[in-house]
């Protein structure tokens, strides 16, 4: 049963889905804005094996310094494991991911963000998600100071216990805010030029 379900997952139809917002975004050209307000900052030309990236108009971090790049496959892939059955798509994921990381690093170094931590390094966080089985895979990269839950950060926090004996740690809520239009446009133009 488990193998049957897994085989079904990795052999799903990755074709364009009219009801998927990310499939629709994959048809846009570099520099165009999505209905959400993100800007397409790079795009591969291969519809079967390509990836595209957007700059989000919102951040969960400091709106004066932080930003989020989201990379997505052009085909409608639901789960990262599906890349194992398409070697070219997997290779192009590696290229898209590393290029996005390079672009973030370049901007952070130019803005001296590496001087904000004791190691004097550029810190980049990332995560990928699919909230339900039909959702288009998307992976986000962002400056590390952006709020993000990591094991090593939270294992040293004071553990609280609620009335039902459930353990938890206190944390500040992450609230997305819109990046100033001037900075957003600057970042979009800069990222497009870096990712050419």
Label each residue range with its predicted role.
Residues 1-196:
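HIT superfamily nucleotide-processing domains
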């Amino acid at each position: 049963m488990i193998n049957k379900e897994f085989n079904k997952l990795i052999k799903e139809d990755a074709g364009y889905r009219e009801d998927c917002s990310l499939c629709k975004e994959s048809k846009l050209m570099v520099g165009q804005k999505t209905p959400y307000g993100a800007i397409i900052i790079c795009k591969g030309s291969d519809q079967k094996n390509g990836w595209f990236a957007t700059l989000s108009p919102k951040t969960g971090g400091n709106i004066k310094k932080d930003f989020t790049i989201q990379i997505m496959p052009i085909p409608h892939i639901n789960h990262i494991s599906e890349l194992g059955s398409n070697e070219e798509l997997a290779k192009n994921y590696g290229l898209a991911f590393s290029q996005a990381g390079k672009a973030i690093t370049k901007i952070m170094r130019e803005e001296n963000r590496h001087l904000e931590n004791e190691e004097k390094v550029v810190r980049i966080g990332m995560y990928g998600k699919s909230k339900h089985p039909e959702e288009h895979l998307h992976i986000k990269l962002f400056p590390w100071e952006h709020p993000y839950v990591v094991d090593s950060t939270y294992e040293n926090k004071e553990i609280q216990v609620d009335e039902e004996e459930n353990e938890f740690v206190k944390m500040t809520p992450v609230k997305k805010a819109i990046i100033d239009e001037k900075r957003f446009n600057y970042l979009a133009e800069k990222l497009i030029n870096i990712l050419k």
